[in-house]
């Protein structure tokens, strides 16, 4: 991914990982992760989706606090390899058939937090087509970008997972009218 991602299959997050992939020098390598998702698949139609964030790729970084250090567009690629009972294989990749929409996370920075617009929620967005996740005009074709396959490398470093959840201490309205949960 160019940026951070969470990937979902049939409405469930495929791992407990957060801030994936870890930091890398994007001009030298692109990290990928491997997940076992067999238990999340079911007969018939299955739905995969991803939520993207700026991360280290295009978010604020470094002593200069500059943005877009490696690029200015987030991107995500996925390859799902299906192995059937008879041993045959099928590979499903992301590509121009994928669709995108504006997510409720409208701002996401590693060091500056997150802004969430609940009005943009689609409760079942990563599940097979339901009236709730396919409102007319909401989804659009994604823009595909080439990536240098030679730079792909398996993530070897440890992964980031939630260790503790801390409840909000207060909710208030900021001077600009937005609601802040702190």
Which functions belong to the PLM regions below?
Residues 1-118, 182:
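Accessory beta-strand-rich segments of carbohydrate-active enzymes
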Residues 88-181:
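Activation corresponds to long, low-complexity, non-globular regions
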């Amino acid at each position: 991914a160019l940026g951070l991602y969470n990937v979902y299959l049939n409405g469930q997050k495929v791992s407990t990982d957060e801030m994936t992939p870890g930091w890398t020098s994007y001009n030298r390598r692109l990290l990928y992760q491997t997940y076992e998702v067999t238990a999340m698949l079911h007969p018939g139609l299955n739905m995969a989706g991803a939520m993207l964030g700026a991360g280290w790729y295009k978010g604020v970084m470094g002593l200069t606090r500059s943005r877009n250090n490696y690029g200015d567009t987030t991107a995500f690629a996925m390859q799902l390899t299906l192995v059937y009972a008879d041993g045959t294989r099928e590979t499903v990749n992301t590509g121009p058939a994928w669709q995108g929409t504006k997510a409720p996370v409208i701002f996401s920075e590693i060091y500056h937090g997150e802004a969430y617009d609940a009005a943009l929620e689609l409760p079942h967005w990563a599940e097979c087509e339901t009236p709730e996740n396919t409102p007319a005009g909401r989804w659009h074709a994604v823009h595909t970008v080439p990536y240098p396959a030679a730079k792909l490398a398996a993530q070897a470093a440890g992964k980031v997972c939630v260790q503790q959840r801390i409840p909000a201490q207060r909710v208030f309205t900021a001077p600009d009218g937005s609601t802040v949960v702190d």
